[in-house]
């Protein structure tokens, strides 16, 4: 990631700290990965605090595929198997089966219904029967070591929520342009400025965890 284009949001450490503060206060952030990887920017919200209004914004400007990033332990608790036994996707995106809240939703696709599903999945007392399968929310299972084990948006979302002192669960969705193409760094930065959101890179988060000895969450 060309860090120069992110200087508007501060240096690497400042961007992470600002992102954590925003998440603590219930706001979303934009996360960029490497241009040699997926080369895209994702909305990232803490699952614990995401609102219906934020979900509506995400659906309106995103790809429509809203993902709930969960730890391996939470996926086991909810008995969420992987979507396929052998993952042959380019970046090994760790999709589990999709989900829907068993109660409190209609079609499951509205912003309100998706928030209901997310809250059901991250509830302290959540159990497998609380979720129907398939559904309109797509869980992703994070690497146990976070971004230090896999430099993906999934791990970044979980790490950011955890470092912000919230439940280790995040919601993400890729930002798209009005013509349906994927938003790259310039478009992501322009969108973030317009909507007063912080932008950081996964590289920023990796460096932050390494520098601050945040190498083990156990």
Curated annotation (Swiss-Prot):
Q: Name one GO cellular component term.
A: cytosol
Keyword Acetylation annotated? no
Give the enzyme's main class according to its UniProt record, as a single word.
lyase
Any idea which positions bind D-ribulose 5-phosphate?
A: 37-38, 42, 150-154, 174
Q: Which free-text remark accompanies the cofactor?
A: Binds 2 divalent metal cations per subunit. Magnesium or manganese.
Metabolic or biological pathway, per its Swiss-Prot or TrEMBL entry: Cofactor biosynthesis; riboflavin biosynthesis; 2-hydroxy-3-oxobutyl phosphate from D-ribulose 5-phosphate: step 1/1
Which Enzyme Commission number(s) are listed?
A: 4.1.99.12
Keywords for the protein's UniProt record, in alphabetical order: Lyase, Magnesium, Manganese, Metal-binding, Riboflavin biosynthesis
As given in the record, the signal peptide range reads none
Q: Where is Mg(2+) 1 annotated to bind?
A: 38
Question: What's the catalysed reaction?
Answer: D-ribulose 5-phosphate = (2S)-2-hydroxy-3-oxobutyl phosphate + formate + H(+)
Cofactor(s) demanded: Mg(2+); Mn(2+)
Q: Does the keyword Manganese apply?
A: yes
Q: Name one GO biological process term.
A: riboflavin biosynthetic process
Q: Out of the domains of life, which is the source? A: Bacteria
Q: Which GO terms describe its molecular function?
A: 3,4-dihydroxy-2-butanone-4-phosphate synthase activity; magnesium ion binding; manganese ion binding
Q: Which InterPro entries match?
A: DHBP_synth_RibB-like_a/b_dom, DHBP_synthase_RibB
Family in the record: Belongs to the DHBP synthase family.
The subunit field of the Swiss-Prot or TrEMBL record says: Homodimer.
Q: What does this protein do?
A: Catalyzes the conversion of D-ribulose 5-phosphate to formate and 3,4-dihydroxy-2-butanone 4-phosphate.
Q: What's this protein's name?
A: 3,4-dihydroxy-2-butanone 4-phosphate synthase
What phylogenetic lineage does the species belong to? Answer: Bacteria, Pseudomonadati, Pseudomonadota, Gammaproteobacteria, Enterobacterales
Q: Which gene carries the instructions for this protein?
A: ribB
